């Protein structure tokens, strides 16, 4: 996948931080790419940063409709005062307030994946959703910025699964994603947080 990185869209892929990435915003992060266009840049959300704050404490009407753990996730360092929701609808459903993401692989996402307008009354959309997660903020890169970071060895670009986006144990996601790749990346999953303690 990385050989043609400059012309392939990364929408729907995972960005998994390599051990070289020491920025505290992204240390051992797993980012799901929501949108990637050559002219406008890239937008994604960090999947493995659950907060202690319940969704119901911030968005009272949505609290009972989100996947477990039912907490707000820190989606990234940009726009942290705004919520962004990802959801998978039930079979054949395209509810009001749900917008499909472009370029989603039908094998991985047979029901689709999209965003939910959190201003939509939950009673109009929630019953048609299979899974939903709410993020405060997002990760963003200007045009060409993410490709440069990938070339510098900051990110692994890997395929995403539904379980990655909606996993019940998000804190262990970085290691799980790397382990399932096998080979060298499975070895990277065993790196200690502080290599000097090894």
Curated annotation (Swiss-Prot):
Alphabetized SUPFAM superfamilies for the sequence: VC0467-like
Top-rank lineage group of the source organism: Bacteria
Cellular component terms per the entry's GO annotation: cytosol
Coiled-coil intervals, chain numbering: none
Entry's family note: Belongs to the UPF0301 (AlgH) family.
Protein name as it appears in the record: UPF0301 protein Tfu_2389
Originating organism: Thermobifida fusca (strain YX)
């Amino acid at each position: 996948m990385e050989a043609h990185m400059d012309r392939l869209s990364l929408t729907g892929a995972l960005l998994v931080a390599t051990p070289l990435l020491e920025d505290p915003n992204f240390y051992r992060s797993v980012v799901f790419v929501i949108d990637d266009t050559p002219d406008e840049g890239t937008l994604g959300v960090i999947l493995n940063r659950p907060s202690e704050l319940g969704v119901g404490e911030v968005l009272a009407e949505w609290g009972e409709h989100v996947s477990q753990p039912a907490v707000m996730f820190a989606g990234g360092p940009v726009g942290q005062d705004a919520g962004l929701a990802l959801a998978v609808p039930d079979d054949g459903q395209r509810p009001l307030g749900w917008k499909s993401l472009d370029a989603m692989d039908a094998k991985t996402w047979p029901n689709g994946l999209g965003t939910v307008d959190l201003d939509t009354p939950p009673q109009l959309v929630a019953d048609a959703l299979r899974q939903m997660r709410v993020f405060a903020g997002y990760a963003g890169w200007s045009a060409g910025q993410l490709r440069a970071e990938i070339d510098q060895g900051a990110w692994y670009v890997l395929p995403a699964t539904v379980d990655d986006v909606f996993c019940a144990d998000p804190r262990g996601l970085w290691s799980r994603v790397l382990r399932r790749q096998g080979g060298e990346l499975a070895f990277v999953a065993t790196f200690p947080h502080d290599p000097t303690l090894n």
